[in-house]
Structures are given as structure tokens and as C-alpha cells.
Amino acid sequence: MSRYSYQSLLDWLYGGVDPSFAGNGGPDCAAFLSWQQRLLESVVVLTLALLEILVALRHILRQKEDGRGGRSSQPQQVTQRPEEGKESLSKNLLLVALCLIFGVEVGFKFATKTVIYLLNPCHLVTMMHIFLLACPPCPGATVIFKLQMHMLNGALLALLFPVVNTRLLPFELEIYYIQHAMLYVVPVYLLWKGGAYTPEPLCNFQWALLSTGLMFFYHFSFLQILGLVTEVNLNNMLCPAISDPFYGPWYRIWASGHQTLMTMTHGKLVILFSYMAGPLCKYLLDLLRLPAKKID
């Protein structure tokens, strides 16, 4: 018999999930909502998510066809430097740092037998960031970049309403905050590089709509089904987090509303911040420089 049987594999994936921690999982968490309410919410949200995906794809593909004749609809891109295309030192250092941070987080998941939590959206976005830093600029990287720009709202929620009651290992809590902070560092860095990492215009919400539909479809289909089968509260699809301000039987309805609003606007605010931060930093640096004295 193989040493790693099917049962040991399941134990390796979620055997360390302790239902005694509030909001972590277990039978009580899985039964937090009645099956009728869960089914009704899932049907409504999945239908809306599919409509959002179809509408967004239709407009994006139409814009792509219209853009073949010219680039007038594209935003102004950062002036490309002569060394554009070469791996910069800063990009490589950021990639190494992110890989080390995420590697430690993965190690914690293996050590605590909670590897299943790597399916949570923040970890998936971190993997997308590693790909963007490692992959040369290309059309595929541009698509992933535009999608992840509108998937960063989870990092804000994780920082404002942290769920850290299960992080008991040394430095596990610190890695939690560092990883979620890095979810903002990488996009802002890529925005400053420009080129293939140029977002859509601020008035264009099609990519935000597509990201919203994909995130809700992922949550109410894959994460919810897997959570019900394993009784693991993946991204709070079974029961609300202990820090949820909308704790109660309608927490998913509230979440669908405020997360739709956040997904549609949060990425735009990050883009706007990156546009303002660059000139602001340059202005502050110019202020710090002492004026040169003219010698007659």
C-alpha cells in the first residue's frame, strides 16, 4: 500500500481545521444557514454573476475589435525606457520577497494541515502577482493584471477585519499582515512600470464588472460546494467570520452588496492613488532639495 493513502491526503488538506474555533468550520458552521436559504441565495447570485461575466466580455471583446483600427481609446502610457523588456533589479527583488513571504505562508498551511485554505481568494491573487512579476510582459499578463486590479478588496477587508484566532504558530500572525500588505505593493509597483501593466481608463468599468462576476461565481460555486463537503468555512461561505460587522443569517446578502460596490470601485481608487502618488513623491523630493546658490 502507498504510504500516502486517500485518507491521509484528506487529512493533509484539512485535517488541522479545528471546528472549536469560531468561524473555522464544522457541523454547526455548515448548518448556520438553512438549505432553502442557501440554495435560493446561490441561484440568484450565480445567475447575476453569469450575466455580469457575459455583459463584461461582450463589451471587452467589442472594444478590442474597435481598437484594432486605432489606439485612441487607450489611456496614456508611461514612457518606455530604453531598457524596457529587461528584468529590472527592483522587479526581481520584489519577486524574491513575495515568493519568500508566500512560501512561509504555504509552509504554515502544511504544518497546520490546512492546505485547503490556499484556495481562498487572497492566496490566489498572491499567486497571480508572482506570475505577473515572473512573466515577461505579454497580452496574457495584461489580462491577468487588469483582472487582479479589481480583486484587491479582499486584502482591505482582511486588514480591517482580521480573522487571526487560528494563527498560533510563531510569526504566523506577522506573515498574515505582511502578505495582505504586499497585495497592494505589487499592483502599485506594476502600475508605475506601465507598458503592458497599463489599466483601462478610469471611466471604463467592464474589467471591474468581469472581476466581480468571476469572484462571485467562484465563491458561490466552487468554494461553497467544497466547503459543504469538507465542512471547512472557505472564505466565510458557510458561516460569518467572528469579525463580520453584519453577523447574522443575512450576512451573505450584505456581503454581496458591499463587495459588489467595493469590487467596482476599490480597484479604481488604487489606480487613482498610483497616478497621484508618483507626481506627489517627485514633488516632495524636489522640495527637499536645497536650491543651488549662484556664485558670481
UniProtKB/Swiss-Prot annotation:
Sequence segments annotated as region (Disordered): 66-85
Polar residues bias (residue ranges): 71-80
UniProt keyword terms in alphabetical order: Membrane, Transmembrane, Transmembrane helix
Gene Ontology terms: biological process: positive regulation of ferroptosis
Domain of life: Eukaryota
A Pfam family that the UniProt record links to this protein: TMEM164
Function recorded in the entry: Positive regulator of ferroptosis.
Annotated family: Belongs to the TMEM164 family.
Name this polypeptide is given: Transmembrane protein 164
Originating organism: Mus musculus (Mouse)
Organism ancestry: Eukaryota, Metazoa, Chordata, Craniata, Vertebrata
